[in-house]
Amino acid sequence: MSINWKNELEEGLHYSKAAEGLKLNGKVDNETLYHIICLSVEKFLASLAGMVNYIPIHSGLTFVARELGKKMDFPEKYLNEVRFLNGFMTYCSLDFEKPKVISEVDISRMLGFMVDLKNFTESRAI
């Protein structure tokens, strides 16, 4: 069994395009945009995992990014950006946490990372 990295890449590209378009149109709030960006990042990471025949045993973005760093030349700065994304997730916490407000600066950083990861992933597609 393996991951069909081409399908994962294609889905990531669709989410990426949607995130960029929604940001330009201003049709959704930052929290919704954040989730679409995370879906895109998840798909790009899954595509990279498939390229190196790796099936993640955990679905967390940070876990997958860290494992990719062991299996390929994966930029350390991407791991930091994935951690930044995860910093806004509160739904897995056992304690009640007030959701963090996602600012325009945060969204710009997330979109920049998403585009960098997209380009990185596409450059490795054979």
Predicted regions and their residues:
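Terminal alpha-helical segments
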Residues: 1-126
